[in-house]
């Protein structure tokens, strides 16, 4: 079996406050800043900024 890599799963939460989120893989060795993407929020029905939070 293959080794488990160093990638982490992180939650990208909507800044619109709708509670909608995406789950993304992240390599902590390469990225030191928090991830942020402008993606579609179907609850708000528009593109908003999604920022990284810890996945629990």
Swiss-Prot record:
Keyword line: Ribonucleoprotein, Ribosomal protein
Taxonomic superkingdom: Bacteria
GO terms for cellular component: cytoplasm; large ribosomal subunit
Gene3D superfamilies hit by this protein: Ribosomal protein L33 (2.20.28.120)
Entries under InterPro entries matching the protein: Ribosomal_bL33 (IPR001705), Ribosomal_bL33_sf (IPR038584), Ribosomal_zn-bd (IPR011332)
GO terms, molecular function: structural constituent of ribosome
Biological process terms in GO annotation: translation
Listed Pfam families: Ribosomal_L33
Keyword Ribonucleoprotein (UniProt): yes
Xref: HAMAP family: Ribosomal_bL33 (MF_00294)
Family to which this protein belongs: Belongs to the bacterial ribosomal protein bL33 family.
Protein name per Swiss-Prot or TrEMBL: Large ribosomal subunit protein bL33
Organism: Ehrlichia ruminantium (strain Gardel)
């Amino acid at each position: 079996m293959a080794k488990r890599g160093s990638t982490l799963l992180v939650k990208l939460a909507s800044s619109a406050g709708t509670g909608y989120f995406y789950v993304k893989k992240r390599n902590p060795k390469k990225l030191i800043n928090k991830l942020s993407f402008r993606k579609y929020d179907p609850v708000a029905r528009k593109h908003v900024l999604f920022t990284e939070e810890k996945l629990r």
